[in-house]
Every structure is written in structure tokens, then in C-alpha cells.
Regions:
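Carbohydrate-binding surfaces of carbohydrate-active enzymes
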Residues: 100-260
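Substrate-binding/catalytic cleft of secreted carbohydrate-active enzymes
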Residues: 1-150
Length: 260
């Protein structure tokens, strides 16, 4: 397999497998890969001692919060080869994992099981209605039931609810309230190599769901916030009369300054 796909630019890590054992055959597989490609690291969550980087599957949030501080002596860099199982209404706790992972430069992230629901069109024999068919819907026995329906996308690649949660958590810039009475927010540039100068930063204020201050430009962070840096900035609320009985939200948008 390595020979067949070695020139694919999208491949950055080789994996020795998923959910198998720690046998000596994996040591030999690692050696074989290195005779072909020494430019990419190799991971294998069942035996971190024989590969180039650390990994595991489905750790608790508490474990990740400890591991990023060096509590467990894990091998860096670290990549959680599976940490979320997108079945049903899942992946609602991603932000807790990522707040821990993004607190260090040594955790590379993790992989979600998986991208797309694996089903095909089937039809109700009575009504003729079309639906997504999977395990058992075609009279197949034995089958794995709905364990092929784990995606953040439907079989036709339309997004499920999980998709929007993942998109939000995986965004390259983070914004956090620090002191909203005084308009202070924190901007975190999650990128590893580029500052925020490619973006126009625009914020709007909403009162009880209605926009009361629109498209205000925040120019300072564009050049000031470098890769992996956090800085506080003040929104100019001097022209707004805040009502103690109202609910307020600030929407901050990062728009490309130039078309790309």
C-alpha cells in the first residue's frame, strides 16, 4: 500500500493499522515502511514504543487535560487516532477535548469515526417511500446494524448536525469573552505558521436577537496576533446604550481580506 500511494501529497502520517494487536509483525511493518519513506512519521496506537509519535483511542477528557501537561509521560508529538464516534446525536463534547489539545503545541489533534454515513437508497415496499438503507434493510444476515452510520455527513454528502459542531470547533481562530461589560475579548490564532493579516475582522452586537451595531472593523489583531498567540482586544461600545434587562451577543467574523 505504501508503494501505491507514497506520492499522494495529502498523506502526512503512516499508520500501521487500527484496532489490532501489538505483535512483532508491526515492528517489521514499521521497518519496511522506513526502507521506502523516511520523510513521514509512523503512528500505531496499540504500541507507541515502536513508532515515531504517540497515539491512543477514546481517552477521557480528563485524561487529555492531564496528558497535555506532561502528567502521563506520553510520547510527543501526540495524535489521538480516534476520539469521537459520530453515531446518532454525537460529538457534542468536542470543545472540551480541543480546549485541552490547543493549550499545547505538542498535541496534533485527533480523528473522528467517521466522515460519511455508509448507506444506499432503499424503498418501503408498502408506501414506496425512499430511505437510507443499511444493515438488515436488504434481508442481509448477519449484519452490523447501524454501525456503518457514523458519519458527520449523510450518504449524499449533505451535512448532519455534527458537521456544524465540528466546523465550529475546528475553526482556525478562537474568540473568547474576557470582560464583556468593557468590551474585552481574547483572540487566539490557532494557526502554526501564519499571522492574521489575511483577514478582515468584523464584529456586530445583537440585543435580544436584533442587530444594534453592525460590521464594526477591528484592525489591530491583523498584524499583532502571530501564530499560536493569544491577545486581548477591546471592542468600542461607547456609542451603545446597554440595557440591564436585555440579552446581548457579539458576533466576530474573520473574512479573507483578498480573494483566494
Amino acid at each position: 500500500m505504501v508503494y501505491n500511494i507514497i506520492n499522494h501529497a495529502s498523506i502526512v502520517i503512516w499508520s500501521l493499522g487500527n484496532g489490532a494487536g501489538p505483535g512483532n509483525n508491526f515492528v517489521e511493518a514499521y521497518k519496511a515502511i522506513k526502507t521506502v519513506d523516511t520523510t513521514r512519521p509512523v503512528q500505531y496506537e496499540r504500541n507507541n514504543d515502536i513508532v515515531d509519535m504517540g497515539s491512543n483511542q477514546y481517552p477521557s477528557i480528563a485524561w487529555v487535560q492531564g496528558a497535555v501537561t506532561g502528567k502521563y509521560g506520553v510520547k510527543y508529538p501526540y495524535h489521538i487516532s480516534e476520539y469521537a464516534h459520530s453515531m446518532g446525536n454525537a460529538v457534542g463534547n468536542l470543545i472540551d477535548y480541543w480546549e485541552a489539545m490547543e493549550s499545547t503545541n505538542f498535541f496534533m489533534g485527533g480523528a473522528i469515526w467517521d466522515w460519511v454515513d455508509q448507506a444506499i437508497n432503499n424503498y418501503d415496499p408498502v408506501t414506496g417511500d425512499k430511505y437510507w438503507g443499511y444493515g438488515g434493510d436488504f434481508g442481509d444476515k448477519p449484519n452490523d446494524g447501524m454501525f456503518c452510520m457514523n458519519g458527520i455527513m449523510r450518504p449524499d454528502l449533505s451535512p448532519k448536525g455534527q458537521y456544524f459542531e465540528v466546523k465550529k470547533v475546528y475553526q482556525n481562530v478562537g474568540v473568547k469573552a474576557v470582560d464583556m461589560k468593557n468590551g474585552v475579548i481574547e483572540i487566539f490564532n490557532k494557526n502554526y505558521f501564519v499571522p492574521l493579516n489575511d483577514y478582515e475582522i468584523v464584529w456586530s452586537l445583537y440585543e435580544n436577537g436584533e442587530c444594534v451595531l453592525a460590521n464594526q472593523y477591528l484592525t489591530g489583531p491583523r498584524m499583532a496576533v502571530g501564530p499560536r498567540e493569544k491577545q486581548n482586544f477591546r471592542l468600542d461600545l461607547s456609542g451603545v446604550q446597554l440595557n440591564e434587562t436585555s440579552e446581548y451577543f457579539v458576533k466576530v467574523q474573520f473574512k479573507l481580506a483578498n480573494n483566494k
